[in-house]
A protein has these predicted regions:
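Anionic-ligand binding patches
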Residues: 1-148
Length: 148
């Protein structure tokens, strides 16, 4: 998806383009919502609705399987040049889901995602700290050589 977006806008503007595609993968849901993470919030990307859908989907699956709250955020960044050259980098942040929303910082699924090695959700963390450990930061560290 990030390649499609970067290619489209680079060709349309004849400029170098950087595109991001990120998503939350939940093990018990076989990687869903994944690249459709924002779509789980409906037409208006309502993440309160998306989070409710996550919890409802997990409850349905729990009845039939051993439970796991493992999850990961994945970000793919793509740089695309007007000459057709491109470079993509992926950042992955493993963690787990909280059993309820915690915190009001950040956006999207931040109130239910706890990064591995931490006890707080992204929604409870100071945004200036979160951005130094998240999946986008990991992807950017791999791609930043094109911007220095």
């Amino acid at each position: 998806n990030s390649l499609i977006k970067a290619s489209y806008f680079s060709k349309k503007t004849n400029l170098v383009c950087l595109s991001d595609d990120s998503g939350l993968e939940i093990d018990i849901l076989n990687g869903k919502p994944g690249i459709y993470s924002s779509r789980w919030g409906g037409k208006r990307n309502n993440f309160n609705l998306a989070i409710k859908k996550v919890f409802k989907s997990i409850e349905k699956v729990k009845k039939n399987r051993l439970t796991s709250n493992k999850a990961r955020f994945i970000c793919c960044l793509t740089v695309f040049w007007p000459n057709g050259q491109s470079y993509s980098a992926t950042g992955i942040l493993n963690g787990k889901l909280s059993n309820k929303k915690k915190g009001n910082k950040g956006f999207g699924y931040d109130p239910i995602f706890i990064p591995k090695g931490y006890k707080k959700t992204f929604g409870e963390m100071d945004p200036s700290f979160k951005i130094r450990i998240d999946h986008r930061h990991k992807a950017y560290n791999k791609i930043r050589k094109f911007f220095i």
